[in-house]
């Protein structure tokens, strides 16, 4: 009871939590005081002793039903006396007006200037109110299911069910409610008031200035120290509930479960934090373009801004800011390029062994969170157009995920353009067939052909043309698992003339289609040109040799294949090669590209061929005693039973 009496005594005296004086017998927790909203009564004036009789003080009534008593020293202005009391409550004198209460005229007050000598007001009662055109910071939260893609403004994670302020548009998860800033203001009005306190008020009641967008406000809040954010946004801070009824869209004020945050506790009426406002305006002023301030002489106001009758829409784009600070700042999720997450710093990759060199680059074995293959492309001083084309193709390659495709892991742009891919411990198909001369069974060769066709079918379904399909770019990973690499990248497989991309014959000569060699079209590469290269790979599998081995001159091969005088010798195919495979090889290497099949048809043909191959199945009537892990697992009684019974 003593605690309750002390609480009522404190509330009846009208002190706020921060200014309340508690004696030892009347100490109560903030939660008890928070349940009682302060209501100033006329009888309160007679209960308090006049502060002028004891010291040089002034009693001040503040917004949100708060009050304080300030000490006055000689030479201090009214602004100096009240600055600290306003600052701890997040107020600014420019946003408020001060009045002297006239007791001889009940209910009336006289406005004072902030530069008034405070000594002349000792013993008086003052009242500080918000200016009429300065909005309060009351959030208007409502539950919302975001059917469109949305992200939490606090944790930047995907948001489906959460809350949204109907006034400022701030959206967040329920578990992020403790970090919601208390700011919910018309930032254009705040900015106009602070930048141009003496400007002429327009027809709408406020100076007509470009408004500060919500995005910039949130960026300024994100730059605040964590301690400052928690100071003004924590739900455990003492707040004063207003006596006005809550809006329809606000959350219910009933007591919630202690396991879930009370979102309403951050939606109480609080003043705007001055430091947050200054930070937002400072960042906006630095980023504003000087040309935005220019206007015709007829439309200029005394402050240098135009004053249209209708509000000026918020600026949608922010002027670029140069400097290292902008580079080091984390970019918002909505503005960051998705390929940003795939770019690898060159300092993070350690190159070790040089694996080989091709017509488009050099391959190294490297370390980046494990073994990787790094292909440094032969592109010296890429132009902006070439660099952008490379990034566009990387955006396509990073979406490839298939069991028969070499995994793309990232790219590098510093010093040289480079591609980082999965490392395959096995050798390439070229080494197996022509260097190590590995002897494969026919069913193994057919399975390699099927996996290769399956991977190429996936690439073509993604509208990716390989352009350099050959046995050197087919890897056998962990046994006989096929991995296709070095696909796409038309940027580095083309010749550039200034800013224009010019197609040229690319790839190894033996695997190049006749139309690619002739280069009669602007872009001869197509799905059918990849099919021709795949047909040469089938020829290697079914013969163990390279085509045109009897011709030693490279230029002669180019001339004869391009003119249609030479084609792979199909008589060298293995004798045990199935007839369906022979027909498939012949169809893939046809000289007219329209007559070649596409990979969906090729894949179905090989799968049908695999099912038709004869298989030796184990007899189901004979036991497999040798499969037992231990001989004692076999029941000895079974072995000594009557000969009439079967032995298992």
From Swiss-Prot:
Positions of the RBD domain: 56-131
Binding-site residues, ATP: 355-363, 375
Modification Phosphoserine, positions: 29, 43, 252, 259, 289, 296, 301, 338-339, 471, 494, 499, 621, 642
Notes on activation and inhibition: Regulation is a highly complex process involving membrane recruitment, protein-protein interactions, dimerization, and phosphorylation/dephosphorylation events. Ras-GTP recruits RAF1 to the membrane, thereby promoting its activation. The inactive conformation of RAF1 is maintained by autoinhibitory interactions occurring between the N-terminal regulatory and the C-terminal catalytic domains and by the binding of a 14-3-3 protein that contacts two phosphorylation sites, Ser-259 and Ser-621.
Catalytic activity: L-seryl-[protein] + ATP = O-phospho-L-seryl-[protein] + ADP + H(+); L-threonyl-[protein] + ATP = O-phospho-L-threonyl-[protein] + ADP + H(+)
Phosphotyrosine sites (modified residues): 340-341
Protein name listed in UniProt: RAF proto-oncogene serine/threonine-protein kinase
Taxonomic path: Eukaryota, Metazoa, Chordata, Craniata, Vertebrata
């Amino acid at each position: 009871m003593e605690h309750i009496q002390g609480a009522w005594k404190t509330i009846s005296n009208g002190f706020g939590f921060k200014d309340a004086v508690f004696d030892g017998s009347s100490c109560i927790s903030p939660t008890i005081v928070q349940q009682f909203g302060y209501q100033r009564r006329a009888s309160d004036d007679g209960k308090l002793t006049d502060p002028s009789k004891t010291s040089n003080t002034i009693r001040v009534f503040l917004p949100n039903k708060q009050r304080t008593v300030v000490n006055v020293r000689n030479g201090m202005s009214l602004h100096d006396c009240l600055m600290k009391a306003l600052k701890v409550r997040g107020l600014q004198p420019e946003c408020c007006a001060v009045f002297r209460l006239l007791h001889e005229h009940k209910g009336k007050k006289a406005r004072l200037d902030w530069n008034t000598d405070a000594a002349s007001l000792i013993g008086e009662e003052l009242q500080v109110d918000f200016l009429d055109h300065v909005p309060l910071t009351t959030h208007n939260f409502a539950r919302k299911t975001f059917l469109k893609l949305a992200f939490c403004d606090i944790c930047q994670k995907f948001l489906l069910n959460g809350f949204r302020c109907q006034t400022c548009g701030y959206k967040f998860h329920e578990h992020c409610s403790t970090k919601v800033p208390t700011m919910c203001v018309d930032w254009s009005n705040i900015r106009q008031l602070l930048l141009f306190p003496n400007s002429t008020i327009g027809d709408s009641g406020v100076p007509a200035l470009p408004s500060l967008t919500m995005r910039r406000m949130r960026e300024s809040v994100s730059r605040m120290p964590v301690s400052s954010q928690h100071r003004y946004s924590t739900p455990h801070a003492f707040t004063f509930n207003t006596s006005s009824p809550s809006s329809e869209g606000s959350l219910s004020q009933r007591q919630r479960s202690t396991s879930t945050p009370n979102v309403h506790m951050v939606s109480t009426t609080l003043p705007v934090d001055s430091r947050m406002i200054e930070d937002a305006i400072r960042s906006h002023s630095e980023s504003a373009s000087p040309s935005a301030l220019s206007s015709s002489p007829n439309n200029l106001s005394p402050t240098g801004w135009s004053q249209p009758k209708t509000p000026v829409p918020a600026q949608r784009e922010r002027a670029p800011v140069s400097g290292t600070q902008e580079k080091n700042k984390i970019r918002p999720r909505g503005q960051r390029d998705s390929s940003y997450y795939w770019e690898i710093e060159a300092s993070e990759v350690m190159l070790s062994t040089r694996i080989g060199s091709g017509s488009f680059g050099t391959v190294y074995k490297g370390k980046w969170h494990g073994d990787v293959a790094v292909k440094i492309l032969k592109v010296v001083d890429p132009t902006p157009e070439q660099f952008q084309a490379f990034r566009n193709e990387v955006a396509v390659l990073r979406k490839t995920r298939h069991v028969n495709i070499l995994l793309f892991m990232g790219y590098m742009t510093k010093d040289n353009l480079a591609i980082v891919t999965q490392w395959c411990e096995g050798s390439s198909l070229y080494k197996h067939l022509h260097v190590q001369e590995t002897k494969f069974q026919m069913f193994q060769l057919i399975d390699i052909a099927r996996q290769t066709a399956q991977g190429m079918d996936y690439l073509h379904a993604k509208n990716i043309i390989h352009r350099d399909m050959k046995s050197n770019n087919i890897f056998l990973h962990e046994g006989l698992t096929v991995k296709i690499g070095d696909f796409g990248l038309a940027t580095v497989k083309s010749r550039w003339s200034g800013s224009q991309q010019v197609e040229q014959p690319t790839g190894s000569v033996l695997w190049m289609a006749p139309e690619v060699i002739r280069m009669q079209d602007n872009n001869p590469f197509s799905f059918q040109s990849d099919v021709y290269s795949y047909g040469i790979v089938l020829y290697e599998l079914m013969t163990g040799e390279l085509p045109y081995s009897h011709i030693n001159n490279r230029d002669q091969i180019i001339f004869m294949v391009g003119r249609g005088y030479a084609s792979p010798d199909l008589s060298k195919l293995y004798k045990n090669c199935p007839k369906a495979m022979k027909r498939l090889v012949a169809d893939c290497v046809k000289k007219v590209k329209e007559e070649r099949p596409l990979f969906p048809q090729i894949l179905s043909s090989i799968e049908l061929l695999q099912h038709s191959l004869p298989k030796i199945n184990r007899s189901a009537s004979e036991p497999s005693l040798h499969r037992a892990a231990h001989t004692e697992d076999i029941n000895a009684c079974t072995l000594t039973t009557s000969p009439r019974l079967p032995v298992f």
